[in-house]
Amino acid sequence: MAFSQVQCLDDNHVNWRSSESKPEFFYSEEQRLALEALVARGRDAFYEVLKRENIRDFLSELELSRIVEAIEVYDPGSEDPRVSGRRPEPQDNGGADASEETSAAGGPPATETLPSLEYWPQKSDRSIPQLDLGWPDTIAYRGVTRASVYMQPPIDGQPHIKEVVRKMVSQAQKVIAVVMDMFTDVDIFKDLLDAGFKRKVAVYIIVDESNVKYFLHMCERARMHLGHLKNLRVRSSGGTEFFTRSATKFKGVLAQKFMFVDGDRAVCGSYSFTWSAARTDRNVISVLSGQVVEMFDRQFQELYLMSQSVSLKDIPMEKEPEPEPIVLPSVVPLVPTGTMAKKLVNPKYALVKAKSVDEIAKSSSDKQEVTRPPGLRGPAVAERPGDLSELLPPVHPGLLNLERANMFEYLPTWVEPDPEPGSDILGYINIIDPNIWNPQPNQMNRIKIRDTAHASAQHQLWKQSQGARPCPAPCPPPAPRDSQGVVPAENGFPQGNPEPQAPVPKPRTVPVASVLARDGSDIGWALDTPEKETPQNGIDPRLPSTASESEVPQQQHSSMTQDDPDGLERGLPNGLDEDEDDDDDYVTLSDQDSLSGSSGPGPGHRRPSVASSMSDEYFEVRERSVPLQRRHSEQMANGPGHPPRRQLSAPHVTRGTFGGPLSSPLWAQGRSREDVDASRIQGQRPMDRQAQGQHFHRHGSTTSRTPGPPRFRPAADGTQSSSKKASPAAAGPHHWQPKGSPTPRMLPDPGSPRPTRNTRLRAELRATEEHASPFGIPYSKLSQSKHLKARAGGSQWAPSDSKRRARDHKEP
């Protein structure tokens, strides 16, 4: 029904009277009676009603002629899509002749069920059209409303209205909805077809049903193909209908003209998509955006719901061509801004990188060359977005001469309290396993931070010394000793192998039977085979008797003193007891490339280790509570040794030398610095080993300013160790000699706080030993000195006189 008729059914219009002079005047019962007379009896009856009701002549001659031509008999069956689209004229009788013509025109046969004539049908006779190609989501707020007005012909240098419309079509990405009374412009229609076929944009078109035939003629001129129909929907609609009491009706035309794009823009006005409207007619359009676009959204959905489909099957179309390959241009990375470039090269990112940028680029390029087919090796044009080569961003000009910040100063490190002069250890970084809820100190690893400046200088001096030495001997001859038995310092690697080679780790297990079978107290260093014997003085001629401190952290060779009484009286250059041995047989778990010097089978050059090994600090627990103390022997007689420099970005996780802030070690309580220096230089007096048997610890007297029980001295990383003359027969099953080790080693007491290095014995003692601290002492046993003594005295590995020795060392 017409809108005026719908308003009459509203409760607000009951007894509502309005005159023609008021703005709200819309519906008039007198005008309705005049239209009823026009439709039923013609124009003369129309003018008679106007005179009788004394109302204005509200229809023009053009409108009278259009209404008379548009009158049709209201027949519910004619609206069925299965019936021919021929519209019956008012002059037709609508009887049997009309039904026969309908059947002849291809209508439904008599046996087929006709549309229902029920007033409230259970099911609709027609399906509701759906926006099957997609529609933008409903947005609560679309933004601020903005409007731009364009005229035809353009004024003030504005683009013409056709250009504005075509640009909006080319910029569409989601949906284009067009409502037009007359659509015959081929250029705009081709733009819509390309948007739907090439860019997959949904295109909906609604045209006036009286102008559908002109639209179909345009489709024939556009040379469409079948691919254009995939994302195109065309429907037709008309104006509102006016129903009369004589079972007739007439309908208006679709005069709305707007285009709705992507749910956020719309263009409307008097412009129709025709050539004449863009060239000769004067029109105006408005381009709108913002919240006002919501009205166009709702209006199009309502029109689409009441519209009828337009079939394009009768239009001759070509086959769908193959889609053209989309060649994307190679995107050159833009130079980042100065602020962003500084963020990208921030040194703090080096702490979380697993590899350096050069290694990542090299590995990725090698992988691409391997996976690429042989025919495509070398530079090739990328045809797909995934084939684009990843180029490293260029260095920003602002970063060329920019000094990098040292972010290690901001790390949560624990610097050693009062470090010794010349120590290269700056601090430690905790590494805690996130899977452990409450980590203990023995479950933490640490990264030792060292100063590599001195190591670089030592490396340069070694290069200069290597270039100046003409002798290619594998090892230098034994250096002469001075009067005190101290070997002069000598920096550098052995001359035989100037290029460091990657060491090959080998098992350290040695058959015990072969060790027990050997007899003799004069057996010294066994490097290659058990059959080879060393000289009587206990020095291997292939190795130097002593080594300088610079050689120790790089070569990891163990020094040896002559097995004579005088040698025991000499001061140990590195502050080691004879019982203590260095850490050269430990391998850092996180860095497989760092191996110690004794991991190989021979005395040749090994690759220097850049990782810190397990600490050799140990203590003797007495009855009175003695706090844990850290012993330092990094300061050696010949100067501090430094490991070679390594990249900060390389993965390197090692285990530190003390338990961290949880264990709270105190620094040098009960022993002054002068006492430590004196104990490193002063030698140990020999003891009668044959009378008391072989023991695991050397109990000697040291000259100390502080009275108290004797203490064990630690062995630091990369230091030398002296030999001890012992008989394998006297040691019994506790004596073993690893392959490649320069001296026979003694199995430590299970009760000793020092961690054992024999993997086989470690497996046997795992059931009885608790989790040890980084010093090797269980935290639960630190205060139980009696129990610890009992274990040390009554252990199955302890000799028979161990208890007597423990009693000898009690405080008086």
From Swiss-Prot:
Annotated region Disordered: the residues are 76-119, 362-389, 455-509, 521-812
Q: Which SUPFAM superfamilies match?
A: Phospholipase D/nuclease (SSF56024)
Q: Which residues carry this modification: Phosphoserine?
A: S4, S124, S127, S356, S609, S613, S615, S649
Instruction: Assign the protein's first listed, main location to one coarse class.
Output: cytoplasm
For the modification N-acetylalanine, the affected residues are A2
**Family (UniProt):** Belongs to the FAM83 family.
By what name is this protein known?
Protein FAM83G
Name the species this protein comes from: Mus musculus
Whichever gene encodes this chain, its name is: Fam83g
